């Protein structure tokens, strides 16, 4: 059998059904933590992971492509922590990259002071933590476990129960010490921005 045929997922096999069940358990345990990940990145990983790992029955090609997927998603998670957004002159969200001098963006800032979006130490802390959360998700993923470290599956159930609460406590501590008001790429706007947008809409309607 060629490696090309091994890249096609076998969704009807008992092993794939078991992997799907284990993955669902992992996602349930990490439900409160995956909210910290960029939505688009998480969606792409969950969509492509079963295909690229062949539901855990990997060839060399599967391992290479799965590794590339993990690397790209990891980069996306870190990169998103160094982005932010503001309300543009047309009322829509505009994104940019945070720098030492402020927010670098292609959009017209209007009256927005981009210097207040300066790079902070908290951005690096959050980037490291978000990467750790994504790494936890990858570690507990049944397809990835079967593909790269099949012997690890014996202890995976224990980690699914123990690891998410531990990471949850760490996340609460980190975000208490380093609060963030960033609403970058892949993240929903913060409550203050949502409230301001609603007030603007109400004012325009009443006018």
UniProtKB/Swiss-Prot annotation:
Residues 1-20 are annotated as: Disordered. One of its GO terms (biological process) is membrane fusion. The chain crosses the membrane at residues 33-53, 64-84, 121-141, 159-179. InterPro entries: DMP. It is found in: Endoplasmic reticulum membrane; Vacuole membrane. GO terms for cellular component: endoplasmic reticulum; endoplasmic reticulum membrane; plant-type vacuole membrane. Expressed in leaves, siliques and roots. It holds the Pfam family DUF679. Keywords: Endoplasmic reticulum, Membrane, Transmembrane, Transmembrane helix, Vacuole. It is a multi-pass membrane protein. Involved in membrane remodeling including fission during breakdown of the endoplasmic reticulum (ER) and the tonoplast during leaf senescence and in membrane fusion during vacuole biogenesis in roots. Belongs to the plant DMP1 protein family. This is Protein DMP1.
């Amino acid at each position: 059998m060629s490696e090309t045929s091994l890249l096609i997922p076998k969704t009807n096999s008992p092993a794939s059904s078991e992997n799907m069940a284990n993955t669902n358990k992992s996602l349930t345990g990490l439900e409160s933590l995956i909210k910290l990940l960029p939505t688009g990145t998480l969606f792409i990983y969950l969509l492509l992971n079963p295909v690229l790992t062949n539901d855990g029955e990997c060839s060399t090609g599967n391992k290479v492509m799965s590794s590339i997927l993990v690397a790209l998603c990891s980069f996306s998670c870190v990169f998103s922590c160094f982005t932010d957004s503001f309300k543009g002159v047309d009322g829509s969200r505009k994104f940019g990259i945070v720098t030492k001098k402020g927010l670098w963006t292609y959009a017209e800032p209007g009256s927005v002071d981009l210097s207040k979006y300066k790079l902070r130490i908290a951005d690096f802390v959050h980037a490291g933590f978000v990467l750790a959360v994504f790494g936890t998700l990858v570690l507990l993923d049944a397809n990835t476990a079967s593909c790269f470290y099949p012997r690890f599956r014996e202890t995976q159930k224990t980690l699914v129960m123990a690891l998410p609460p531990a990471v949850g406590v760490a996340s609460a501590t980190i975000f208490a010490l380093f609060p963030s008001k960033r609403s970058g790429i892949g993240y929903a706007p913060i409550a203050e921005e949502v409230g301001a947008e609603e007030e603007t809409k109400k004012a325009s309607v009443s006018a």
